[in-house]
From Swiss-Prot:
The keyword Cell membrane does not apply. It catalyses: Cleaves several transcription factors that are type-2 transmembrane proteins within membrane-spanning domains. Known substrates include sterol regulatory element-binding protein (SREBP) -1, SREBP-2 and forms of the transcriptional activator ATF6. SREBP-2 is cleaved at the site 477-DRSRILL-|-CVLTFLCLSFNPLTSLLQWGGA-505. The residues Asn-Pro, 11 residues distal to the site of cleavage in the membrane-spanning domain, are important for cleavage by S2P endopeptidase. Replacement of either of these residues does not prevent cleavage, but there is no cleavage if both of these residues are replaced. GO terms for biological process: bone maturation; cholesterol metabolic process; membrane protein intracellular domain proteolysis; mitotic G2 DNA damage checkpoint signaling; positive regulation of cholesterol biosynthetic process; positive regulation of transcription by RNA polymerase II; protein maturation; regulation of response to endoplasmic reticulum stress. Its EC number is 3.4.24.85. This is Membrane-bound transcription factor site-2 protease. Glycans are attached at residue 334. CDD domains: cpPDZ_MBTPS2-like, S2P-M50_PDZ_SREBP. The lineage of its organism: Eukaryota, Metazoa, Chordata, Craniata, Vertebrata. The gene is MBTPS2. The active site is at residue 169. Keywords: Cholesterol metabolism, Cytoplasm, Glycoprotein, Golgi apparatus, Hydrolase, Lipid metabolism, Membrane, Metal-binding, Metalloprotease, Protease, Steroid metabolism, Sterol metabolism, Transmembrane, Transmembrane helix, Zinc.
Length: 516
């Protein structure tokens, strides 16, 4: 759900701005001075939309557009080729995304029906997880602040949107000046909560130049977004090298935040500044290892621990085992915070259950799957496996020099409530959050700049793709099809198809995000 406070602030803020604008424009005393002030500052206000335009940057744009003309010519030629390829590729990408979304909807529908008909929980879980992974693999996803975009990351999101938009429009502006089109100004706007940028070009000049020149201008925006995304990927890859004088990597993951409701909180839990090196027997050297280890723990059976027969006899006590609702076995007091029910096979291969103090049972022991794994170290040892609910795991988290944390719960809860980084500061005065901030922002910049390039390339009404398509058809079909009406009709149907495809993706994407 979108936070109510966010909606109240946005609607209340825009209402206040619009009413103030309306009152000042209706005032006998302030009307002329206020309108003059708006005009002099290049401001215009309408419901849920503020626009600012200036000619202050015109000299800079003209300087960029006239510098190294030959190099810019080649640069925008590359951009033109990329733009045309991207325009046609966007059809395939949107079609693939639409098929994936429909597949996800069908998977969710079958999962709901199987749940209502009392299917086995394991099969339902696998169906749900596979459909979720299918949705997460999509190249394009609808983003709604407060639903699938955390509120605490809105700053990254909107900053990346604004920078991507500015770079996009700078591309259009420089290309236009390079093609001798008059540049009137540059501006920034705010629509509801989304920021953006624009350039004001002299339309008559734009219509007089050749279709190929128009293509260079119209493709320049998405070309610059593509290059920005590539630079972001390069920066992300080189980030460990860039930060090497101040931060090192490859020895574990550093805890940067533990949520207040995290199961990892406690006297023997995780704390900010702890360095995690292992999850069970899975070594952790970076964030990717952490995620892969948690995935392995989630989807593989619970691992066991070797315990000697003498220790088992000493720690265990008579218990009464019973079945849980999910079919697993419990043999400890439900309210116990230290004891866990373990299962094992004795020398006669009979499965038994015993309630043991978890820390004493698993501390300083090797992991195992069967008794054979334990016979290597001692002939009189057993492999005891925690008997937990279907999706619950006992995870031993190593974070030296502190004592190992024993986590009992769903691995995903650990994943979502504990924030980590691969970067460890070399000096105490350095912030552990700085690499996380830089890394997160660069990832948003890559995603949003790339998305802006893809979406704007779609031959859809009111997007760059419309003008790219029109110029492309003018450049290629004018000599083939003499009748302009036929050419325009072809363009119209392509635009209609692209618009329907994009609208379907957005509508179904919104439904998937808000209705799940």
């Amino acid at each position: 759900m979108i936070p109510v406070s966010l909606v109240v602030v946005v609607v209340g803020g825009w209402t206040a701005v619009y009413l103030t604008d309306l009152v000042l424009k209706s005032s006998v005393y302030f009307k002329h001075s206020y309108e003059d002030w708006l005009e002099n500052n290049g401001l215009s206000i309408s419901p849920f939309h503020i626009r600012w335009q200036t000619a202050v940057f015109n000299r800079a744009f003209y300087s960029w557009g006239r510098r190294k003309a030959r190099m810019l010519y080649q640069w925008f030629n590359f951009g033109m080729v990329f733009g045309v390829i991207a325009m046609f590729s966007s059809f395939f990408l949107l079609g693939k995304t639409l098929i994936q979304t429909l597949g996800q909807m069908m998977a969710d529908s079958s999962y709901s029906s199987s749940s209502s008909s009392s299917s086995h929980s394991s099969s339902s879980s696998s169906s749900s997880s596979s459909s979720s992974s299918l949705y997460n693999e999509q190249v394009l996803q609808v983003v709604v602040p407060g639903i699938n975009l955390p509120v605490n990351q809105l700053t990254y999101f909107f900053a990346a949107v604004l920078i991507s938009g500015v770079v996009h429009e700078i591309g259009h502006g420089i290309a236009a000046i390079r093609e001798q089109v008059r540049f009137n100004g540059f501006g920034i706007f705010l629509f509801i909560i989304y920021p953006g940028a624009f350039v004001d070009l002299f339309t008559t000049h734009l219509q007089l130049i050749s279709p190929v020149q128009q293509l260079r201008i119209f493709c320049a925006g998405i070309w610059h977004n593509f290059i920005l995304a590539l630079l972001g990927i390069l920066a992300l890859i080189l980030l460990p090298v860039i930060l090497l004088p101040f931060y090192y990597t490859g020895v574990g993951v550093l805890i940067t935040e533990v949520a207040e409701d995290s199961p990892a909180i406690g006297p023997r839990g995780l704390f900010v500044g702890d360095l995690v090196t292992h999850l069970q027997d899975c070594p952790v050297t970076n964030v990717q290892d952490w995620n892969e280890c948690l995935d392995t723990i989630t989807y593989e059976p619970q691992i066991g621990y070797c315990i000697s027969a003498s220790t088992l006899q000493q720690l265990s006590f008579p218990v009464r085992a019973y079945k849980r609702l999910d079919g697993s076995t419990e043999c400890c007091n439900n309210h116990s915070l230290t004891d866990v029910c373990f299962s094992y096979r004795n020398n006669f291969n009979k499965r038994l259950h015993t309630c043991l103090p978890a820390r004493k049972a698993v501390e300083a022991t090797q992991v195992c799957r069967t008794n054979k794994d334990c016979k290597k170290s001692s002939s009189s040892s057993f492999c005891i496996i925690p008997s937990l609910e279907t999706h619950t795991r006992l995870i031993k988290v190593k974070h030296p020099p502190q004592i190992d944390m024993l986590y009992v719960g769903h691995p995903l809860h650990l994943h979502y409530t504990v924030s980590i980084t691969s970067f460890i500061p070399r000096f105490k005065f350095l912030s552990i959050d700085l690499p996380v901030v830089v890394e997160t922002f660069v990832k948003y910049l890559i995603s949003l700049s790339g998305a802006l390039a893809i979406v704007n390339a779609v031959p859809c009404f009111a997007l760059d793709g419309q003008w790219i398509l029109n110029s492309f058809l003018d450049a290629t079909l004018t000599s083939v099809i003499g009748d302009n009406d036929v050419k325009d009709l072809i363009g119209f149907f392509i635009l209609l198809g692209g618009s329907i495809l994009l609208a379907a993706n957005v509508a179904l994407g919104l439904w998937m995000v808000t209705a799940r």
